[in-house]
Amino acid sequence: MMQDEHGKSKQTLIMIVDDDAALGEMLSIVLNGSGFETVTCQDGLRAVEMFPTLHPDLVLLDIMLPGLDGVQVAQRIRQTANTPIIMLTAKSDTTDVVKGLEAGADDYVVKPFEVVELMARIKARLRTLGMGASSDGAAAKLPEFLHCGILEMNRVRHTAKKNGIDLHLTPMEFELLYVLAVHEDEPLSRTSLLKQVWGYDDGGDAKLVNVHVQRLRMKVESNPEKPQIVQTVRGIGYKFVAPTE
């Protein structure tokens, strides 16, 4: 269950955008059976038109679509909303995956996939959105507020400000920055970040971390080409250094 702007509980709405009608119907049945409300769409342009009215809590988005492809749909959504997006792709090709992530997707699943795998990805993304509902309680152990130099982060309101200016981070960008900041000056491996931020217990794709770091740097760094806040640690991963100016 999610909450509306008045704090009242509402059924979580998942928008399924896939030109495979049979797959869309199957996913709807599975998700409805798990307590989610669903709406399906088979065309990218129609999905963009429907999104502002529906205000879904999460979007399952195929890459190969008529009208507009999934990358274009993700770009349109990200212009106005930070709604979690999970890409569904029949291609594991690096280029397609990276394009989807760069467009604003939070995660991806390669077809054919096990339903249990997709459900795990959905629940992990909704936990990130809800902040603190992780089954192992790990998220609840993180502090609600951080003040690191000129950067302020509020995990309750899901906001990050640099010099008092809102950075407008997506839920995944916020969570990535928050986890790095909690471990200030401590190098974290991509495997560790995949577990702490994305909820992958085993495996996971390092591209998820790399592309999200690139996106994050575009918003938090004064010069993304020479990052001072989210720094690369060769052979390990990344570390957070509190900004002072």
Q: Which ranges hold each PLM region?
A:
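Non-catalytic signal-transmission and effector/linker regions of two-component phosphorelay proteins
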Residues: 1-15
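Short hydrophobic/Thr-rich beta-strand motif most characteristic of the beta2 strand and flanking loop
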Residues: 35-42, 50
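Charged docking surfaces used in two-component/phosphorelay signaling
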Residues: 25-33
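Positively charged, aromatic-enriched patches within helix-turn-helix-type DNA-binding elements
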Residues: 159-236
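Active-site beta3 strand of CheY-like receiver
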Residues: 54-60, 65
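Basic, amphipathic DNA-recognition helix from helix-turn-helix-like DNA-binding domains
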Residues: 75, 79, 84-147
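Acidic catalytic/metal-coordinating carboxylates
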Residues: 43-46, 69-72
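Short, Lys/Arg-enriched segments at the junction into DNA-binding effector domains
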Residues: 10-13, 124-187, 191
